[in-house]
Swiss-Prot record:
Transit sequence range: 1-29
Localization of this protein: Mitochondrion matrix; Cell membrane
Further information: In eukaryotes there are cytoplasmic, mitochondrial and chloroplastic isozymes.
Keyword Cell membrane: yes
Protein name per its UniProtKB record: Aspartate aminotransferase, mitochondrial
Gene behind the chain: aatA
Positions that bind substrate: G60, W156, N209, R401
Free-text function comment from the UniProt entry: Plays a key role in amino acid metabolism. Important for metabolite exchange between mitochondria and cytosol.
InterPro entries xref list: Aminotransferase_I/II_large, Asp_trans, NHTrfase_class1_PyrdxlP-BS, PyrdxlP-dep_Trfase, PyrdxlP-dep_Trfase_major, PyrdxlP-dep_Trfase_small
Assembly information from the UniProt record: Homodimer.
PROSITE patterns to which the protein is assigned, alphabetical: AA_TRANSFER_CLASS_1
Coarse class of the protein's main subcellular location: mitochondrion
GO terms of molecular function: kynurenine-oxoglutarate transaminase activity; L-aspartate:2-oxoglutarate aminotransferase activity; pyridoxal phosphate binding
PANTHER family: ASPARTATE AMINOTRANSFERASE, ASPARTATE AMINOTRANSFERASE, MITOCHONDRIAL
Length: 426
């Protein structure tokens, strides 16, 4: 009887503990639903719309004349070469595919870059541009402690989030002038000069996102001088090489100028837009150093940082870019194709302005053609953007940014007519 009583008591005690434990399994009751990404939200609204006239001007990916995703012919040929080579699927090193890293640095900095020739550069493969920026932010948090990152106002939305998540304070410098839809160079240089010595200055190498507004060569020179005088550390976000002007060399001019001026920059590259490899998530992060020993030290620390982050990068995108850039014929084909994409975007800018005038708009839309790259800051107000969505089924972000890649010969006049209507008397 005593043993039975103890057994019953133990069972009841166990059941009580189980009940107590089960009440503690609801770990996530305090997690609230987060806000939707404002850019991705545009596509969600577009997909819900059933109108045959709908246009998505929020997507950050190139589309062909028929509004379809575009796979470059040089990528198809590189893909075929890789398949026929019957390559394995082993892990890449932590730093990624070495040949890709070398070619990526050469594409951005030029084959004659002294840092490359003298091995005064540490380059690692990254998970596209976002991954490169995250590596940069985490590295700066460890080795540029106490520094603040300065980003243009406005800038790509992920910049602030990435630096904040890495524990780096973020401030902005003047960049865009809403009155002219152009560069506020005076505010930009004033703010960069006023930043504490040794600050981190993030610059868009070309095709500024979201405005499409870039400094001139003379303005870049002045920015370089100010950064040097103030001892600032310069980080370039280089997501659109070749995609802005159609010339990889022209688009790299600012980056190469800063290096020639003596800046040991950091560089974040993406191969999503210019190679059409969005889903392959292929990028690179580089730091230029004073000596080759410093480059080795930096690389060793980057490996330590990357190992618990994602350990090893995916190899396929790197193999594609490598296959193209190491083959002269494929490289020339890529140059031709990236120019073709850039030229189509430039042409759509011109067509949009032409049709805006045709439909009676008296506003000055010249900024549409002076801005460059995939995106255009139209100057439309949030209320006008809402009207475009509600009345015309045209979707874009509420700051007035449109993706020119979403425009083609079949929808450009409809877009212009709608823009003329919502901006009438404004």
């Amino acid at each position: 009887m005593i043993r039975s009583a103890r057994l019953i008591s133990n069972i009841k005690f166990g059941q009580k503990n189980i009940r107590q434990f089960s009440t503690n399994t609801n770990w996530w009751a305090n997690v609230q639903k987060g806000p939707e990404d404002p850019i991705l939200g545009v596509s969600i609204a577009y997909n819900k719309d059933t109108s045959p006239s709908k246009i998505n001007l929020g997507v950050g990916a190139y589309r062909d004349e028929n509004g379809k995703p575009y796979v470059l012919d040089c990528v198809k040929k590189a893909d075929k070469k890789i398949y026929e080579a019957n390559v394995d699927h082993e892990y890449a090193p932590i730093v990624g595919v070495a040949a890709f890293n070398q070619l990526a640095a050469q594409l951005a900095l030029g084959e004659e870059c002294k840092h490359i020739k003298e091995k005064r550069i540490a380059t690692v493969q990254s998970i596209s541009g976002t991954g490169a920026l995250r590596i940069a932010a985490d590295f700066f948090a460890r080795f540029l402690k106490g520094k603040t990152a300065y980003v243009p106002n406005p800038t790509w939305g992920n910049h602030n989030v990435i630096f904040n998540d890495a524990g780096i304070p973020v401030k902005s410098y003047g960049y865009y002038n809403p009155a002219t839809c152009g560069l506020n160079f005076e505010a930009m240089t004033k703010d960069i000069a006023a930043a504490p010595e040794g600050s981190i200055i993030l610059l868009h190498a070309c095709a500024h996102n979201p405005t499409g507004v870039d400094p001139t060569a003379e303005q870049w020179k002045k920015i370089s001088e100010i950064c040097k005088e103030r001892g600032h550390f310069v980080l370039f976000d280089f997501a659109y090489q070749g995609f802005a002007s159609g010339s990889p060399e022209k688009d790299a001019a600012a980056v190469r100028m800063f290096v020639e001026d003596g800046h040991n920059i950091a560089l974040c590259q993406s191969f999503a837009k210019n190679f059409g490899l969005y889903g392959e998530r292929i990028g690179a992060f580089s730091i230029l150093t004073e000596t080759s020993d410093q480059a080795l030290n930096v690389e060793s620390q980057l490996k330590i940082l990357i190992r618990p982050m994602y350990s090893n990068p995916p190899v396929y995108g790197a193999r594609l870019v490598q296959a193209i850039l190491k083959d002269k014929e494929l490289t020339n084909e890529w140059r031709s194709e990236v120019k073709g994409m850039a030229d189509r975007i430039i042409n759509m800018r011109e067509q949009l302005v032409k049709y805006l005038k045709k439909h009676g708009s008296t506003r000055d839309w010249s900024h549409i053609t002076t801005q460059i790259g995939m995106f255009c800051f139209t100057g439309l107000t949030p209320e006008q953007v809402d009207r475009l969505a509600n009345e015309y089924h045209i979707y874009l972000t509420r700051n007035g940014r449109i993706s020119i890649a979403g425009i083609n010969s079949t929808n450009v006049e409809y877009l212009a007519k709608a823009m003329a209507a919502v901006t009438k008397d404004n």
